[in-house]
C-alpha cells in the first residue's frame, strides 16, 4: 500500500528497508538521542547485538507480512520515503490507556514519527507524513488522536503544537536522559486548530 503526499510517500515495509534500518541502529544513530533515548542508555554491546538480532528477525517477518497484504487491511504505521525513492523514516500508531500508558488493548490512538535520515530533516517531510497519516487514520474511523514525546525533544514539541496538538497530560520527571530529569508529555489533537493548520498549508 502506498499513499502519495506532497514530496513524500507513505508505504508498507519492504525487505530492502532492512539494510537501512540496520545502519540507523548501528552507525547513523544520532536520532536515538531524541527518540526515546532512555531505551538506549546503559545497554551493553552484548545486549545491543542480541536486540539487533531480534530486530532483524522481526523486520524479516514484517517484509513477509506486508508483501501480499491487501490495501483494505488497516495499517498501524507506514514507512516514509521521498518521491525519488529514498527511505528516510517511519510513522506509526499505538494505543494508550486513560493514564497515558501504552497498552496492548484497545485504547486512545497515539501517533509517533521518526526521521533518522539527517539529510531529510528541515524540509517539511515530517509535516507532510503526519498529515497523510492522520488523514489515513481518519478514513479508518479514528477521530481522537494523541501524540507522545518528552520535554527534551523540542523539535517534536514544536511540530506537535504547530499542527494543533494541545498538551493533554504531563508526567513530571518520569524520564532521565543523559543524567537530567525530563517530563513525559501527551498531546491531543485539537480538530479546529488542526483544520486551521491544514488551511494555512494550502
Please state what every model-predicted region is:
Residues 1-118, 180-202:
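GNAT-family acyltransferases
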Residues 116, 147-157:
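Conserved beta-strand-loop-alpha-helix junction that forms the acyl-donor binding cleft
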Residues 119-120, 175:
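PDZ/PDZ-like domain micro-motif
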Residues 40, 152, 175:
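Positions that flank functional sites
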Residues 98, 146-149, 166-183:
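Conserved catalytic-core motifs of GNAT/GCN5-like acyltransferases
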Residues 122-139, 154-162:
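Conserved acetyl-CoA-binding loop-helix of GNAT-fold acetyltransferases
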Amino acid at each position: 500500500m502506498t499513499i502519495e503526499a506532497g514530496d513524500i510517500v507513505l508505504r508498507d515495509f519492504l525487505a530492502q528497508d532492512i539494510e537501512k534500518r540496520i545502519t540507523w541502529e548501528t552507525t547513523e544513530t544520532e536520532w536515538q538521542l531524541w527518540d526515546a533515548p532512555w531505551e538506549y542508555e546503559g545497554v551493553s554491546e552484548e545486549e545491543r547485538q542480541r536486540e539487533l538480532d531480534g530486530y532483524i528477525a522481526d523486520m524479516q517477518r514484517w517484509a513477509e507480512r506486508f508483501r501480499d497484504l491487501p490495501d483494505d487491511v488497516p495499517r498501524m504505521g507506514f514507512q516514509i520515503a521521498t518521491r525519488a525513492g529514498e527511505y528516510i523514516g517511519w510513522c506509526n500508531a499505538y494505543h494508550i490507556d486513560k493514564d497515558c500508558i501504552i497498552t496492548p488493548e484497545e485504547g486512545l490512538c497515539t501517533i509517533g514519527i521518526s526521521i533518522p535520515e539527517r539529510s531529510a530533516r528541515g524540509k517539511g517531510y515530517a509535516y507532510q507524513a503526519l498529515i497523510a497519516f492522520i488523514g489515513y487514520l481518519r478514513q479508518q474511523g479514528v477521530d481522537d488522536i494523541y501524540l507522545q514525546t518528552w520535554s527534551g525533544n523540542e523539535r517534536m514539541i514544536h511540530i506537535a503544537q504547530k499542527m494543533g496538538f494541545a498538551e493533554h497530560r504531563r508526567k513530571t520527571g518520569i524520564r532521565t536522559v543523559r543524567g537530567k530529569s525530563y517530563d513525559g508529555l501527551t498531546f491531543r489533537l485539537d480538530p479546529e486548530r488542526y483544520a486551521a493548520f491544514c488551511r494555512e498549508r494550502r
